[in-house]
From Swiss-Prot:
<dbReference type="Pfam" id="PF04836">
    <property type="entry name" value="IFRD_C"/>
</dbReference>
<dbReference type="GO" id="GO:0045944">
    <property type="term" value="P:positive regulation of transcription by RNA polymerase II"/>
</dbReference>
<dbReference type="GO" id="GO:0030517">
    <property type="term" value="P:negative regulation of axon extension"/>
</dbReference>
<protein>
    <recommendedName>
        <fullName>Interferon-related developmental regulator 1</fullName>
    </recommendedName>
</protein>
<dbReference type="GO" id="GO:0014706">
    <property type="term" value="P:striated muscle tissue development"/>
</dbReference>
<dbReference type="GO" id="GO:0061629">
    <property type="term" value="F:RNA polymerase II-specific DNA-binding transcription factor binding"/>
</dbReference>
<feature type="compositionally biased region" description="Gly residues">
    <location>
        <begin position="12"/>
        <end position="21"/>
    </location>
</feature>
<dbReference type="GO" id="GO:0060612">
    <property type="term" value="P:adipose tissue development"/>
</dbReference>
<dbReference type="InterPro" id="IPR039777">
    <property type="entry name" value="IFRD"/>
</dbReference>
<dbReference type="GO" id="GO:0016528">
    <property type="term" value="C:sarcoplasm"/>
</dbReference>
<keyword id="KW-0217">Developmental protein</keyword>
<dbReference type="GO" id="GO:0006357">
    <property type="term" value="P:regulation of transcription by RNA polymerase II"/>
</dbReference>
<keyword id="KW-0221">Differentiation</keyword>
<feature type="compositionally biased region" description="Low complexity">
    <location>
        <begin position="22"/>
        <end position="31"/>
    </location>
</feature>
<dbReference type="GO" id="GO:0005737">
    <property type="term" value="C:cytoplasm"/>
</dbReference>
<feature type="compositionally biased region" description="Basic residues">
    <location>
        <begin position="1"/>
        <end position="10"/>
    </location>
</feature>
<dbReference type="GO" id="GO:0005634">
    <property type="term" value="C:nucleus"/>
</dbReference>
Length: 449
């Protein structure tokens, strides 16, 4: 068909400008006609998002961060956005609910909003409960993450205990559900461990949670013993999260319970060091170092029977040169197991320094390192801000009350981009000179002869 004879082509020139012509041109200009069912879930979510576009973008919290919120937005604007996100957790569309949960998680991770969360904790808990029960994998992961940052915001107390009593059984059910998504189970394991660390007040419930995690990661024991049993990588990821959550909760257990767990797992955990997954090997090594630290804290003359075989295995991992493994994995593994070997043999820990604002925190033990790594995994880039202002985290890491600084002082402490560039350039030159002295110079011999 010739181009000038195309069907539904708009007329050139000024035809009779009636309403039907305008409607026809608008329909044809927009592409093929799409039949839309009245009052469908898709239309409802689009309409809701259009009305709530001012506060429904979860990425704005991740991009702006706490500094921009302080400078450009007021507390009322932030609370208005959060109220809109809370309302969107009840939307019919799963994508809208997930986006709202992610926005809440980003906002609560990057800002301390104790009063706001305290007033709306029941509404938030109901929304999280509904999303955990009826949502799919991604929505469950987002809901579990919001539950953990909700407890971090409130800290230990009656309010967090009520949240844990409501959401704890649901999280535990998802973790133990073999038909659920591995990713959802993994996230729920980490977040459930954090919530229990903060809010648990019943010692029997703490022991029950430990047993729940043990039932999961001990399946890797069986896998290592029985060569006929094969476990897929996603299952190993769940076992890693359960092991790390179990180790975190072990740090707050009474001494008698810690001794029982040490007797039960001390001689089985080394079997995980031969796992094919590098992250499992690292998690097992760091957990062993932490267990040694706890055991020696209870008994200074603690004796481990299989010390020779364990140190031999740790030394092999600290100097691993297996060609069948990726260079990045080998480099990461060697770095971790050098520290683990030093902790087991010499009772030494390489102190790390964490800077946040004008303050510094020294991580000088495996217990402190594991606790810091866990909360950093949950809070992400908001960890530094929470270390400055969150009273609960400051109590956990023994930082004292928050240091109060006004906006002018904080602004003067900031380094400009140009100054950072000069500092990085100078550091790069100094590092290059220092390394050049250690490099082999034999290749240059005879070049100018």
């Amino acid at each position: 068909m010739p181009k000038n004879k195309k069907r539904n082509a708009p007329h050139r020139g000024g035809g009779g400008g009636g309403g039907s012509g305008a409607a026809t041109s608008a329909a044809t200009a927009g592409g093929p006609h799409r039949t839309v069912q009245p009052f469908s879930d898709e239309d409802a979510s689009i309409e809701t998002m259009s009305h709530c576009s001012g506060y429904s973008d979860p990425s704005s919290f991740a991009e702006d961060g706490p500094e921009v919120l302080d400078e450009e937005g007021t507390q009322e604007d932030l609370e208005y956005k959060l109220k809109g996100l809370i309302d969107l957790t009840l939307d019919k569309s799963a994508k809208t609910r997930q986006a709202a949960l992610e926005g809440l998680k980003n906002a609560l991770s990057s800002k301390v909003l104790y009063e706001f969360v305290l007033e709306r904790r029941m509404t938030l808990t109901d929304s999280i409960e509904r999303c955990l029960k009826k949502g799919k994998s991604d929505e469950q992961r987002a809901a579990a993450a919001v539950a953990s940052v909700l407890c971090i915001q409130l800290g230990p107390g009656f309010e967090s205990e009520e949240i844990l009593k409501t959401l704890g059984p649901i999280l535990k059910k998802i973790i133990c559900d073999g038909a659920a998504s591995i990713q959802a189970r993994q996230t729920c394991a980490t977040c459930f461990g954090v919530c229990c660390f903060i809010a648990t007040d019943d010692i029997t419930e703490l022991y029950s949670t430990l047993e729940c995690f043990e039932n999961i990661f001990t399946k890797s024991y069986l896998k290592e013993k029985d060569t006929n049993v094969t476990c897929s990588t996603p299952n190993t990821v769940l076992h890693i999260s359960s092991l790390l959550a179990w180790t975190l909760l072990l740090t707050i257990c009474p001494i008698n319970e810690v001794k029982k767990k040490l007797e039960l797992h001390f001689h089985k955990l080394p079997s995980l060091l031969s796992c094919d997954d590098v992250n499992m090997r690292i998690a097992a090594g760091e957990s062993l170092a932490l267990l040694f630290e706890l055991a020696r804290g209870m008994e200074s003359d603690f004796f481990y029977e299989d010390m020779d075989s364990l140190t031999q295995m740790l030394r092999a991992l600290a100097t691993d040169g297996n060609k069948h493994r990726a260079k990045v994995d080998k480099r990461k593994q060697r770095s971790v197991f050098r520290d683990v070997l030093r902790a087991v043999e010499e009772r030494d820990f390489p102190t790390e320094t964490v800077k946040f604002g004008p303050e510094r925190m020294y991580i000088d033990s495996w217990v402190k390192k594991h606790t810091y790594d866990t909360f950093k995994e949950v809070l992400g880039s908001g960890m530094q801000y929470h270390l400055q202002t969150n009273e609960f985290l400051r109590n956990v890491f023994e930082l004292g009350p928050p240091v109060m600084l006004d906006a002018a002082t904080l602004k003067t402490m900031k380094i400009s981009r140009f100054e950072r560039h000069l500092y990085n350039s100078a550091a790069f030159k100094a590092r290059t000179k220092a390394r050049s002295k250690c490099r082999d110079k034999r290749a240059d011999v005879g070049e100018f002869l």
